[in-house]
Every structure is written in structure tokens, then in C-alpha cells.
């Protein structure tokens, strides 16, 4: 009996260790739900026209964020993020226009903030703009702070949902549009900050937002 116990002890320890490792990783990539009515209070709203009510521009219900296009500005998380994977869908509802996912937004909210803008402008989705003094290795004067997407535009027609994924990891940003890797910038001068969604005057919607916190390694 002792021999049998000794024989199975390493197997037991391996299973226990594997289980703990899986639980640790599962916790590290836990998803969160957004854009419900109760979620509206978890965001900071920044508008160029201070006379406009944020509730007239940004509307949340049943997991969908509606941006009406009034004035210009953005909403951002109250929480700061460093290494993460963001996935969301967006579509233009009346006519195509300009918008973006803002990542690593720095404090002192203004229109426009220090951040990296992942473009959603029609025909340019996947470009990355280094805004107001933030830099990356690829954001040079010669490209005028805009790192163009790698592949031809692959956005869907007006009214159809597009999928965008942004991965922030170890001072790099990767951007996928509808499953295609469109950008990869490195050497970020800001590797943490708030996450936001831009309003630039045209109605659009976002849905199915998830943000996974990634392990540091």
C-alpha cells in the first residue's frame, strides 16, 4: 500500500498544480459586461460643448451604446487599464463617419486627450493615431503621427456590425478589424490609462464590449 501511495503522489501534485494554474489564469482574463442602464454611472463624459447634456449624446441600454453625434467628445472608463484585450462591435447607423476607440487615455480630460486612437473612420479602420504628445516607435514625424493599417480596408457596409479587437501588452498595441491584423505598434510612451469611445459628429453604435485583463509575462 505504501508503494501505491508513493507512486500516485506525483500525479496528484501535478493535477493540483494544473488546477491552481488554470484558476489563476481564468481569474486573470475575467470578462466584464458594459453598456447597460446601470453601467452609465461608471463612465466619465467629456464634451467640447459644455452646454450639451451627456445623456443627449451617449445612451446605454441592454448592452448597446448609442452615440447620437451631437457636439464632439468622448466617454471613458473611470478605471485605468494596462495589459488587456478589448473586443467590441460597432456600426454606423445613418451615414459613415469618423470615430475611434481611445486607449491609454491620460488624466486631465480635454477634447482631444493624450491617448492612442484606434481609428474607426470609414475606410481607415485599423489606423492608429498617437495623440497630443504620446509616441510609439512607429509614430514618427514622417507619418504625421498616424500609423496606417497593414492591409486594405475590410470594413462592412453601412448598417452592418464590424468587430474590432485591441490587445495592449508589454508596451505594444495590436489591432484586428473583422479578424484581420491591421496594426502593431511598439515602444509606447504610455502603457496604461483609461479606455474611451469617441464622438465625432456622426451617429454610431457599439455593443458586446468585453475587456480581459491579461497576465504580465
Positions of predicted regions on the chain:
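Carbohydrate-interacting regions of secretory-pathway proteins
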Residues: 23-217
Amino acid at each position: 500500500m505504501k508503494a501505491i501511495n508513493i507512486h500516485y503522489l506525483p500525479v496528484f501534485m501535478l493535477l493540483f498544480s494544473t488546477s491552481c494554474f488554470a484558476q489563476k489564469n481564468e481569474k486573470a482574463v475575467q470578462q466584464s459586461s458594459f453598456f447597460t442602464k446601470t453601467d452609465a454611472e461608471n463612465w466619465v463624459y467629456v464634451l467640447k460643448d459644455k452646454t450639451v447634456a451627456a445623456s443627449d449624446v451617449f445612451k446605454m441600454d441592454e448592452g448597446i451604446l448609442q452615440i447620437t453625434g451631437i457636439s464632439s467628445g468622448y466617454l471613458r472608463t473611470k478605471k485605468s487599464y494596462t495589459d488587456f484585450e478589448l473586443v467590441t462591435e460597432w456600426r454606423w447607423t445613418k451615414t459613415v463617419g469618423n470615430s475611434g476607440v481611445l486607449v491609454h487615455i491620460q488624466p486631465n480630460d480635454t477634447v482631444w486627450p493624450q491617448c492612442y486612437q484606434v481609428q474607426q473612420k470609414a475606410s481607415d479602420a485599423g489606423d492608429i493615431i498617437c495623440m497630443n504628445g504620446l509616441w510609439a516607435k512607429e509614430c514618427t514625424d514622417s507619418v504625421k503621427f498616424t500609423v496606417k493599417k497593414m492591409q486594405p480596408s475590410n470594413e462592412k457596409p453601412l448598417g452592418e456590425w464590424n468587430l474590432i479587437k485591441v490587445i495592449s501588452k508589454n508596451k505594444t498595441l495590436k489591432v484586428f478589424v473583422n479578424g484581420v491584423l491591421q496594426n502593431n505598434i511598439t515602444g509606447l510612451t504610455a502603457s496604461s490609462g483609461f479606455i474611451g469611445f469617441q464622438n465625432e459628429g456622426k451617429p454610431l453604435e457599439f455593443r458586446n464590449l468585453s475587456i480581459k485583463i491579461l497576465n504580465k509575462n
